[in-house]
Amino acid sequence: MHCPFCGANDTKVIDSRLVADGHQVRRRRQCLACNERYTTFETAELVMPRVIKTDGNRDSFNEDKLRGGIQRALEKRPVSADDIERAINTIKSRLRATGEREVPSDMIGNLVMEALKELDKVAYIRFASVYRSFEDIREFGEEIAKLEK
């Protein structure tokens, strides 16, 4: 790493500590040329896979779209904001864990349905009705029957 004071690239790490609940490393460094000390922070850059839409187009992963869909399904339901954030983070982690550079949009939809099934059954049915394009009341009944098993 280049020294911010003199630009030399000979530096050494004096101290390292985990901060931000272990999601960041704070390093104390010293330049070997000018002996100045400074602090750096390191975080992992977590890249989300691209999304392959049903029409074949490719799009960047949009966390706001994911959050909006989940919040719409959970509207006026007794689920905490923390539980929603946990579900979103779990979905993102599972997508990254695939190791793929691109994932189909239906995979994301299925992960959302799994998360909603755990959080709130009514929200699950709401989301499923739109996601699976239910045509009539019979399809609602079939999905509810699956939940009751």
Swiss-Prot record:
Keywords: ATP-binding, DNA-binding, Metal-binding, Nucleotide-binding, Repressor, Transcription, Transcription regulation, Zinc, Zinc-finger. One of its GO terms (biological process) is negative regulation of DNA-templated transcription. Its cofactor is Zn(2+). A zinc finger (unnamed) spans 3-34. Binds 1 zinc ion. GO terms for molecular function: ATP binding; DNA binding; zinc ion binding. Residues 49-139 form the ATP-cone domain. InterPro entries: ATP-cone_dom, NrdR-like_N, RNR_NrdR-like. Belongs to the NrdR family. Negatively regulates transcription of bacterial ribonucleotide reductase nrd genes and operons by binding to NrdR-boxes. This is Transcriptional repressor NrdR. It comes from Photobacterium profundum (strain SS9). The lineage of its organism: Bacteria, Pseudomonadati, Pseudomonadota, Gammaproteobacteria, Vibrionales.
